[in-house]
Amino acid sequence: MVKIEIGSVGDSFSVASLKAYLSEFIATLLFVFAGVGSALAFAKLTSDAALDPAGLVAVAVAHAFALFVGVSIAANISGGHLNPAVTLGLAVGGNITVITGFFYWIAQCLGSIVACLLLVFVTNGESVPTHGVAAGLGAIEGVVMEIVVTFALVYTVYATAADPKKGSLGTIAPIAIGFIVGANILAAGPFSGGSMNPARSFGPAVVSGDFSQIWIYWVGPLVGGALAGLIYGDVFIGSYAPAPTTESYP
């Protein structure tokens, strides 16, 4: 059963919530700066050559490391979402209210935009690369690819961070989340770009002015995140029986 809670505006503007929004903004900014920056660096070093296997690995590793750090520095304040798809997936499982989640989205998208503006400034006007499906592939293939890889990401978030039975797994959650993002970029990068994150794609689209395929990177990740939240948050966690408070023995 879906456990979505709307919440209240008052709760969403509490001091703790405002701190969470700022945390999401900063962490997303740092993540996108490093992630998009790695793609810019590759283009600079190769004179805008096409992405080769070594470049793909470098970009994947940069995103994995940056997300590991971003989740780690925000986890104790906001939960370390850094991603509207993660926020939606957690909302479907009742881990965050819709209103608060909406403000998370705003903070994440603003962080991404500011990161890309900073990159343009510090690189003296270099063009920010945007996500797009590879030549020969259609939008539907791109959406399905993003659904699958984002499902894997949000499912990992649930298993290592949101599941009340996670135990010691919680200590490796940022590492596992970074690893799955890096692995998914290696798998999906040559085809859809492997975004898994509407905010990660939105910032470059805004700064470059190229919105031609941005809908793919909202629809795919949001559907994938919601499905992961529905399956893990509502089917698995929702089926947990409460632990008994007393035990009786013969």
UniProtKB/Swiss-Prot annotation:
Location in the cell reads:
Vacuole membrane
Q: In which tissues is it expressed?
A: Expressed above groung and in roots.
Q: Where are the transmembrane segments?
A: 25-45, 54-74, 102-122, 134-154, 169-189, 211-231
Give the location of motif NPA 1 in residue numbers. 83-85
Q: What's a GO cellular component annotated to this UniProt protein?
A: plant-type vacuole membrane
Vacuolar compartment segments:
46-53, 123-133, 190-210
Chain location of the short sequence motif NPA 2 per the record = 197-199
Give membrane topology per the record. Multi-pass membrane protein
Keywords, A to Z, come to: Acetylation, Membrane, Methylation, Phosphoprotein, Repeat, Transmembrane, Transmembrane helix, Transport, Vacuole
Pfam families documented for this protein = MIP
State the superkingdom: Eukaryota
Q: Which family does it belong to?
A: Belongs to the MIP/aquaporin (TC 1.A.8) family. TIP (TC 1.A.8.10) subfamily.
Q: What does this protein do?
A: Aquaporins facilitate the transport of water and small neutral solutes across cell membranes.
Q: How does it assemble?
A: Interacts with cucumber mosaic virus (CMV) Protein 1a.
Q: What is this protein called?
A: Probable aquaporin TIP2-2
